[in-house]
Amino acid sequence: MTEPVYIREGFANMLKGKEGVGGKLYLDENMLHHMPHAINIQREETAVLLKEVASVERVRNRLLGIPMLNNCLKVTLHSGLEVQYVVNKAGQWVEDVERAVADAKKSGVV
C-alpha cells in the first residue's frame, strides 16, 4: 500500500458552528481532508473534493464577531456551502489549494 502524497499539511481548526475543531488539514491532488484530534467533542473527519471547490480565499478569523487575525482559509463550494479553517500561513494555503484545483481541472480529475 502506498502512502498518500500531500501537497500541503498542517495543524488546523475547522470552524463548525461555535466550535473550532482542532486537528490536521491535508491537501492532496483530489481533496482537502480535515482529521480532528481525539480530544474534540466533534470527531468526524471532513473531506472536500477539489472538484466541488468554487473559490478559496484568506479571511479574518473572528472572536465574538470581532475580526481578528487574517489566518483563516475560506473554501466556498459550488453548492454555496462555506468551510473555514484557521491555519498557519493562510496565504500559502490559498495558493496551494488554488493550484491543486487548477491542476486537477487540467488533468481531468475535476
Residues of each region from the PLM?
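Anionic N-terminal interaction surfaces
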Residues: 1-29, 46-47, 67-70, 77-81, ...
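Hydrophobic alpha-helical segments, principally membrane-spanning helices and signal/leader peptides
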Residues: 13-14, 34-36
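Phosphoinositide-dependent membrane-docking surfaces
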Residues: 32, 47-62
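Short, hydrophobic/aromatic-rich beta-strand segments within well-structured domains
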Residues: 33, 73-74
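Short aromatic-glycine motifs in intrinsically disordered, low-complexity regions
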Residues: 35-47
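Short acidic, Gly/Pro-enriched loop/turn segments at secondary-structure junctions
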Residues: 39-42, 57-71
